[in-house]
Amino acid sequence: MRKMKERQSKKAKGFFALDRNNMLLKLKEIQHAVSFSKKFLYNWVKIKANHPSEVDPIFALYLVTKRCNFRCVYCYAESNERISKIAPDDLDFDQNVELLKVIRKDVANLYFSGGEPLLRKDIVDILKACRDLNYHILSLTTNGSLLDKKPEVADYLNYLAISLDTLDEKKNDQLSGVRAGTTKKIIAVTKEFAALQKEKNFTLLVNAVIGEHNIPDIYGLMDFCFEHNIGLSVIGQMENFRPIKYLRTSKEYFKLVEHILDCNAKGYPILGMPQFNKTMLMFEKHTCFPLLIPTIYPNGDLLYPCEVLNKKRYNLLETGSIREAYRRGQKEVGKKLDCPGECYMPAFIVASCFMQQPLSAIKQGIKVKMGNCYNQSVKEDRATIKQVV
């Protein structure tokens, strides 16, 4: 009894011994957790009542620029006519701050993508503005080619993702449409940032797109990520938001997928709960809730209900909030979303799996957040990856 009281006393002292800044951070974490839990419960009730058009967004994907210095052969942003026709005009910094204020009214978690976000000269200032606006979780995806020039982005991020499809430098240069030597630089930068995760308190991820061109290479990429404490996120190559025909019939692909799912189940740092990766990589039909994670375009546009169905377009600087854009969408389009659940946008499948398996999603979130300390048995088991091929 006495020892128990001593332990409780130490825990209490530990919290109150925090300096003012750390204590405020802890309180913000608690506040965010409570707010997120309330929103999840509200959305769960709406979905169970078959009113998916009435949910509140939990995350937003912001394509901060359409400009890109890569020309990836599989990029859906280039191949999809519907996306290419969207106004590509980037907002200036002041307009971005106003847009971020609008987004923050409805969500505390923001994911930056593009295009290539680091092509914006003011990207660091934009991330600083997000912190000033009290965003909770900030993520950014980059091709990595400009990270050495803007390393300070990591100071403001919770998650930094680098796109890399193979360690074969010549092949990756060709797939990315860049000059020779670019991938060599990206791999070196990836290693450098992997070593900074603990110091700067962020999680590094590698995003890989699996296609006919690189299936055998993914095994080596997995080993590279696990060796350097990097989370790995993989998806199949898409065309018009659907998997390419080759992957649907490739035995080599499904053999790789089985291995990825096995590693996921064993606790390797593979991003995504098992159900997400199974749905995403096996192309299983799913129930989609696109309004949970809206996509916002460089000029502030939001497509209702999503970029696939694309029935209405609203500019958030004009509507003043995401909820108002949703309200107008419900009024003009109707509350029925008419989604067949056959596209494979990762954000939509994440939302679907989260709402259907919340405990598993929370467990996965904790695992990713603690991705720098996956267990020793997993480290020792890495050699088995090389034996699969």
Regions found by a protein language model. Name each.
Residues 64, 68, 92, 130, ...:
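Generic structural signal for small/hydrophobic residues in well-ordered secondary structure
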Residues 61-63, 114, 141, 161, ...:
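Short beta-strand segments
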Residues 1-54, 299, 311-314, 324, ...:
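Radical SAM enzyme core and accessory elements
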Residues 230, 242-258, 267-368:
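Accessory C-terminal segments flanking Radical SAM cores
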Residues 93-113, 120-236:
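Radical SAM/AdoMet-radical enzyme domain recognition
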Residues 87-91, 177-182, 248-252:
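Alpha-helix N-cap and loop-to-helix initiation/capping positions
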Residues 81-85, 169-176, 241-246:
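A short acidic, helix-capping loop that chelates divalent metal ions and anchors anionic groups
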Residues 10-11, 15-150, 158, 365, ...:
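Conserved alpha-helical substructure of the radical SAM core
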